[in-house]
Amino acid sequence: MIKLRLKRYGKKRAASYRIVAMNSRDRRDGRPLEELGYYNPITDETRLHVDAIAKRLKDGAQPTDTVRRILEKASLLEPAKAKA
């Protein structure tokens, strides 16, 4: 299964992340299928390749919870409905 998830890089205690498409069984910092964007939680900077993300979602890729929140904030996904 293909997942959209975060790949960590940067210095110790100053992490940045790349949003990538990867096989769900691959290790966190392994080689991605495709890089889809960038997220820096310290400065809250986000850059997304919208076309590539839309294509991956259409093909059935599942975002992790954190990536889902980033995509909802960027209006690429509808907010998840609260469970009753």
From Swiss-Prot:
Q: Which UniProt keywords apply?
A: Ribonucleoprotein, Ribosomal protein
A GO molecular function annotation here is: structural constituent of ribosome
Gene3D superfamilies named in the record:
3.30.1320.10
Q: Which GO terms describe its biological process?
A: translation
Q: Does the keyword ATP-binding apply?
A: no
* Coiled-coil regions listed: none
InterPro entries documented for this protein: Ribosomal_bS16 (IPR000307), Ribosomal_bS16_CS (IPR020592), Ribosomal_bS16_dom_sf (IPR023803)
Q: GO terms for CC? A: cytoplasm; small ribosomal subunit
Report the SS bond pairs. none
- The superkingdom listed in its UniProt entry is Bacteria
| NCBIfam families from the UniProt entry | S16 (TIGR00002)
**Family, per entry:** Belongs to the bacterial ribosomal protein bS16 family.
Question: HAMAP family of this UniProt entry?
Answer: Ribosomal_bS16
Q: What is this protein called?
A: Small ribosomal subunit protein bS16
